[in-house]
Amino acid sequence: MRQKLVIGNWKMHGSLAANAALLEGIQAGAGVARATLAVCAPFPYLAQCQALLNGSKVAWGAQDVSAEARGAFTGEVAASMLGEFGCTYVLVGHSERRTYHGETDQAVAAKALRALEFGIVPVVCVGETLAQREAGETEAVVGRQLQAVLEALTVEQLGRVVLAYEPVWAIGTGKTATSEQAQAVHAFLRGQVAARDAGVAGRMAILYGGSVKPDNAAELFSMTDIDGGLIGGASLKSEDFLAIGNA
């Protein structure tokens, strides 16, 4: 049975004082959480996460990583640097990166590969827009996004990846895919991975990332192929994040 995983994506939120209070609250309840908990913080706060969470039951990670190992890439952050700050996870291909920064499927795959090279688990995000869903293109879109990763990674590397399905139309909009809609896409994604390796597919955590809240988490997480959540707004309140972790 796959262990539930709940990752908080703070996006571009936080301050040293607010983070300290948030992490203290999360740690206080992490010991009894049913899911494994992690937070993905903005780069400047990774040292704070390392200092406050080291030795706790809460893991931490980053929200992006460079596909390059090192060099003259101003503004980029290397996977080796994330490793020095104890990052377990890194998000790659989040819809906001794809939309606002023009990240291609191939760039996302390259970032995932680089993270794995330095022992960091890439959380590969895929998802469709409202227009794509209404046009019946959901499987074609997420399948294409996933295929780039499947082609770039070996089976062994794929076994160290976490997937996250984030319907773009349900992020920050208050809209949520029904549990059945989400399950259908998760099952499709697992099937695509299974076509490469059934064992990896059976073990892979596939998270749901579309406006998960304390009042809908339990129903979503009860679905066969939903193994937890990638949490946005609700991860900024310790009580909400813990409630989701206990769903």
UniProtKB/Swiss-Prot annotation:
Catalyzed reactions: D-glyceraldehyde 3-phosphate = dihydroxyacetone phosphate
Active-site residues annotated for this sequence: H94, E166
Pathway: Carbohydrate biosynthesis; gluconeogenesis; Carbohydrate degradation; glycolysis; D-glyceraldehyde 3-phosphate from glycerone phosphate: step 1/1
Main location per the UniProt record: cytoplasm
Enzyme nomenclature, EC number: 5.3.1.1
Top-level EC class as recorded in UniProt: isomerase
Keyword list, A-Z: Cytoplasm, Gluconeogenesis, Glycolysis, Isomerase
Residues engaged in binding substrate: N9, W10, K11, G172, S211, G232, G233
GO biological process, one term: glycolytic process
Isomerase among keywords: yes
HAMAP family with a match to the protein in the record: TIM_B
Family in the record: Belongs to the triosephosphate isomerase family.
Record-given protein name: Triosephosphate isomerase
